[in-house]
Amino acid sequence: MKYAIVEISGRQFWIETGKYYDFNRIPTELGKEITLNRVLLLNNEGEILIGKPYLESVTVKGKILEHLRGRKTLVYKMRPKKKTRKKQGHRQELTRVLIEEIKTN
């Protein structure tokens, strides 16, 4: 099984070829190809390569499928025995990316 651990916008993701993942919003158009260069680890059928901090010879190709919004998160602040209440919601902007290829040079 071939997989890689990639850093995108400060977070690390375990990715495999042929699957799609939701990342924080990437400001590009739908259907465009993207290249992920910050590969931290690669497992190529049992052969493990670890970067220091990144692997220069490995790139991950992906395609942007859609831009979407995540589930709503509610934040509710309240002070007991007072009439102070504050309810606030947040929906994270996401980009769904299909991983097409993990390529080693």
From Swiss-Prot:
A UniProt-annotated Pfam family: Ribosomal_L21p
Tagged with keyword Metal-binding: no
Principal localisation: plastid
Segments traversing the membrane: none
Plastid as UniProt keyword: yes
Domain of life: Eukaryota
Localization: Plastid, Chloroplast
Record keywords, A-Z: Chloroplast, Plastid, Ribonucleoprotein, Ribosomal protein, RNA-binding, rRNA-binding
Annotated GO MF terms: rRNA binding; structural constituent of ribosome
GO biological process: translation
One annotated Gene Ontology cellular component of this protein: chloroplast
Family: Belongs to the bacterial ribosomal protein bL21 family.
Record note on quaternary structure: Part of the 50S ribosomal subunit.
Role played: This protein binds to 23S rRNA.
PANTHER family: 50S RIBOSOMAL PROTEIN L21 (PTHR21349), LARGE RIBOSOMAL SUBUNIT PROTEIN BL21C (PTHR21349:SF7)
Protein's UniProt name: Large ribosomal subunit protein bL21c
Gene field: rpl21
